[in-house]
Amino acid sequence: MIVPVRCFTCGKVIGDKYYEFKRRVEAGEDPEKVLDDLGLERYCCRRMLLSHVELIDDIMHYRVY
């Protein structure tokens, strides 16, 4: 839903890297190389970016009571 600020497993800050990752992957770069360039070497941090699904724009259409 919302981009996680920290890795759920190890606690490393990853929120600042998400939009760079997303931009470069959408431009056609290999996700493995992008994650390496961003300094994400642990598989727990890598999965946080690889498995993230952006749903906040879809959910914002509904009212909260």
From Swiss-Prot:
It comes from the Archaea. InterPro entries: RNA_pol_su_RPB10, RNA_pol_suN_Zn-BS, RPABC5/Rpb10. It is found in: Cytoplasm. One of its GO terms (molecular function) is DNA-directed RNA polymerase activity. Keywords: Cytoplasm, DNA-directed RNA polymerase, Metal-binding, Nucleotidyltransferase, Transcription, Transferase, Zinc. Coiled coil: none annotated. PROSITE patterns: RNA_POL_N_8KD (PS01112). GO terms for biological process: DNA-templated transcription. Signal peptide: none annotated. Binds 1 zinc ion. Its main location: cytoplasm. Zn(2+) binds at residues 7, 10, 44-45. Its EC number is 2.7.7.6. Its cofactor is Zn(2+). It catalyses: RNA(n) + a ribonucleoside 5'-triphosphate = RNA(n+1) + diphosphate. Part of the RNA polymerase complex. Belongs to the archaeal Rpo10/eukaryotic RPB10 RNA polymerase subunit family. DNA-dependent RNA polymerase (RNAP) catalyzes the transcription of DNA into RNA using the four ribonucleoside triphosphates as substrates. This is DNA-directed RNA polymerase subunit Rpo10. It comes from Pyrococcus furiosus (strain ATCC 43587 / DSM 3638 / JCM 8422 / Vc1). The gene is rpo10.
